[in-house]
């Protein structure tokens, strides 16, 4: 039995629950949506511009009061309506090229969303940003302080800061799409999480990453970036983005398996229900089993991916009908590509096989995994700027095959900072014939690409890589188009005994320190 004191203390909360009623309250300027959840959630949507102006959860105001939560930097103006049908409420916000939905199910402390576009927003990116009260929600999850820029001094552009001796940026909150199912902001009594179960209309593939959270001092921002120009390798996709869900809890972290199939009954523009989709199943084979394998499908309208099981078997997510390019990755390194067609209501069987093929290896530095794994500073680069005092020296470095550690080789070389990197190796008399030096890269900046010199032989200057027009390594990105450069080494260039290779950054552009032309290494292999 509850004590009298406990009952008295509980009265305000229980009164709120008892008085809660699922529904819409309409005022001259706003719609107030009551979710009728056990931990009460009410939020207010501006009827003229679609901004969320209030989020009252469990008696606390979680919305930052200086600026609303919205698509982009706000729609400016929109046609906004709200309807209730049984246990569902739908708020629809429309402009000439964009329709945004807020959907609430009776009893759930969740704001479900979806965004349909027929043209890219004028700001050049499509995102939802929840601007939340950072007094009640100061923390960022799962990566913590790396993206808390409050009180910092800008050191690069307006998005990389120095805070208490550490470099921080909103970009350092990113996670690969294939692994990013949930990111949150939290405090001692509240947690708000963005749950992401549908990336089909986003861009960049399974390994793309973008901004997730940023406590900038005025508010704590919780994002879902559907597309942007941040190291983006694909064109933007139109159509419906989502559903995605903003989940409110008191202390626990919500699961990521949220059923949004009810969207099929809510007249959501562009929504494709499960019965109008198909799947692909099969088996991948041939790649190095020490790495995780990923299968990826994409076309101009949609993208999907999955990890394979340990035996290589896989089943895709439910896909829109159409013909797709199907890619098989060893880690993040593409080893095979084919095409497959998907039909509604059926599962297509399609196997895929591939491997990394080189030759008789003289030496290999790193692994063909599409990432700078193990190289110097690679473990830190996702979460801090290259100038950070916690980084090891960038060099220029010398790597000696057979005695150096992998961490003695830099993850990246910069034209104005640590170019060239030097490799020393010993060859036998049987290894003095013609050879190939293969230099794998993952991302370039300002036209940076490798030029190699082997003893007295100087390799050609490669053609410039495709320009992503985006800062990369300084903002925690390492993945671009993954250019691989082969240098043909004439017979007699390699000598029996000690040999020296230098790899330099070449580019017609220039820049200071870490904004000079650069590229990130994947693997360097010499073979015959």
UniProtKB/Swiss-Prot annotation:
Residues 1-20 form the signal peptide. One of its GO terms (cellular component) is extracellular region. Its EC number is 4.2.2.23. InterPro entries: Carb-bd-like_fold, Gal_mutarotase_sf_dom, Galactose-bd-like_sf, GH-type_carb-bd, RG-lyase_II, RG-lyase_III, Rhamnogalacturonase_B, RhgB_N. It holds the Pfam family fn3_3. Its main location: secreted. It is found in: Secreted. The keyword Lyase applies. It catalyses: Endotype eliminative cleavage of L-alpha-rhamnopyranosyl-(1->4)-alpha-D-galactopyranosyluronic acid bonds of rhamnogalacturonan I domains in ramified hairy regions of pectin leaving L-rhamnopyranose at the reducing end and 4-deoxy-4,5-unsaturated D-galactopyranosyluronic acid at the non-reducing end. Keywords: Carbohydrate metabolism, Cell wall biogenesis/degradation, Disulfide bond, Glycoprotein, Lyase, Polysaccharide degradation, Secreted, Signal. It is an enzyme of class 4 (lyase). Glycans are attached at residues 46, 351. Disulfide bonds join 50-93, 184-193. It comes from the Eukaryota. GO terms for molecular function: carbohydrate binding; rhamnogalacturonan endolyase activity. GO terms for biological process: cell wall organization; pectin catabolic process. Pectinolytic enzymes consist of four classes of enzymes: pectin lyase, polygalacturonase, pectin methylesterase and rhamnogalacturonase. Degrades the rhamnogalacturonan I (RG-I) backbone of pectin. Belongs to the polysaccharide lyase 4 family. This is Probable rhamnogalacturonate lyase A.
């Amino acid at each position: 039995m509850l004590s009298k004191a406990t009952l008295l203390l509980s009265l305000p909360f229980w009164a709120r629950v008892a008085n809660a009623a699922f529904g819409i309250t309409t005022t001259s300027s706003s719609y107030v949506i009551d979710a009728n959840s056990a931990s009460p959630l009410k939020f207010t949507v501006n009827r003229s511009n679609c901004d969320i102006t209030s989020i009252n959860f469990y008696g606390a105001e979680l919305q930052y009061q200086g600026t609303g939560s919205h698509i982009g930097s706000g729609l400016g103006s929109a046609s906004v309506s709200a309807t209730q049908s049984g246990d569902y409420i739908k708020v629809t916000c429309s402009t000439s090229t964009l329709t945004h939905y807020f959907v609430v199910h009776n009893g759930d402390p969740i704001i479900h969303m979806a965004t349909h576009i027929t043209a890219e927003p004028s700001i050049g990116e499509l995102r939802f940003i929840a601007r939340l009260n950072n007094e009640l929600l100061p923390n960022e999850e799962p990566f913590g302080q790396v993206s808390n820029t409050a009180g910092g001094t800008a050191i690069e552009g307006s998005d990389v800061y120095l805070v208490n001796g550490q470099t921080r940026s909103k970009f350092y909150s990113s996670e690969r799409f294939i692994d990013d199912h949930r990111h949150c902001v939290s405090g001692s009594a509240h947690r708000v999480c963005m749950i992401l179960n549908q990336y089909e209309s986003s861009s960049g593939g399974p390994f793309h990453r973008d901004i997730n959270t940023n406590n900038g001092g005025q508010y704590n921002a919780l994002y879902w970036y559907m597309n942007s120009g941040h190291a983006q390798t694909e064109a933007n996709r139109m159509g419906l983005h989502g559903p995605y869900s903003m989940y409110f809890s008191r202390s626990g972290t919500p699961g990521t398996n949220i059923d949004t199939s009810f969207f099929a009954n809510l007249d959501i523009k562009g929504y494709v229900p499960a019965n109008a989709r198909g799947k692909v199943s099969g088996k991948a084979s041939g790649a190095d089993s020490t790495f995780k394998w990923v299968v990826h499908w994409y076309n101009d309208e949609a993208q999907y991916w999955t990890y394979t099981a340990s035996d290589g078997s896989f089943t895709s997510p439910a896909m829109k009908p159409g013909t797709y390019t199907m890619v098989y990755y060893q880690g993040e390194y593409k080893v095979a590509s084919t095409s497959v067609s998907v039909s509604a209501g059926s599962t297509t069987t399609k196997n895929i096989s591939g491997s990394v093929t080189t030759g008789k290896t003289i030496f290999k530095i790193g692994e063909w995994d599409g990432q700078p794994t193990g190289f110097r500073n690679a473990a830190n680069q996702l979460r801090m700027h290259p100038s950070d005092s916690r980084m090891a020296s960038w060099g220029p470095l010398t790597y000696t095959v057979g005695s150096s550690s992998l961490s003695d080789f830099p993850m990246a070389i910069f034209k104005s900072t640590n170019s060239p990197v030097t490799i020393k190796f010993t060859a036998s008399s049987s290894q003095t014939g013609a050879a190939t030096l293969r230099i794998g890269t993952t991302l370039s900046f300002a036209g940076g690409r490798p030029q190699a010199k082997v003893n007295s032989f100087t390799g050609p200057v490669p053609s410039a890589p495709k320009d992503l027009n985006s800062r990369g390594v300084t903002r925690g990105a390492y993945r671009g188009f993954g250019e691989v450069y082969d240098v043909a080494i004439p017979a007699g260039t390699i000598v029996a005994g000690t040999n020296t290779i230098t790899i330099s950054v070449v580019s017609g552009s220039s820049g200071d320190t870490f904004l000079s032309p650069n590229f990130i290494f994947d693997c360097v292999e010499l073979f015959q």
